[in-house]
Amino acid sequence: AIRTGDEVTVSCAEGDSGHVYAGRVPFTTITTDLAALPMPRTRLMVNIGNPDTAFRTRFLPNDGVGLARIEFIVAEHIRIHPMALVHPDQVRDAAVRAEIERLTRNAPSPADHFVRELSEGVGTIAAAFWPRPVIVRMSDFKTNEYASLLGGACFEPQEANPMLGFRGAARYAHPAYAEGFALECRALKRVREEMGLTNVKLMIPFCRRVREAEDV
């Protein structure tokens, strides 16, 4: 037990959990002056997917975000397949439909839930690194990953090799996902035009043909 007047050392430098040591523990402080380090010719940009880590990561020496993945926001914050939000009536499982209704009840519409959550997540990342560029990759889930989202099984084909299948740019203009991609575009438009975070730049992933880029 610690008594009044006891000397202890409290350490928060050993991971997620703090430690308390009896007595005064000797330690060495190493200070590095980052301003004195020469800057490389190549711009160093970070990868990020979780908005919760954005404001911590921004303090690392960096030239912006080279890849901001939106899959974490969709899977952890939205949790619902975009097409299930556009067409909730097509979700056949009553329990899944009820869970979608519960998650979206505070939004004007299910589709607005997607736009709000995605724009707030991307906006947090963009604000943390402002005014440095933040390159946001549009969704690049594979079909099996999309199917694992709430309501996703109703909208995704089963593929022998999802890694090379219906993903990236090929999805965006396809009738099976065009309305879902429109929600992504609405969210990123809100980040740039309503939030004013014009440091956001878009990346279209897995573009296999020039025609796919033109269609997008």
Sequence positions of predicted segments:
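Short, compositionally biased
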Residues: 20-36
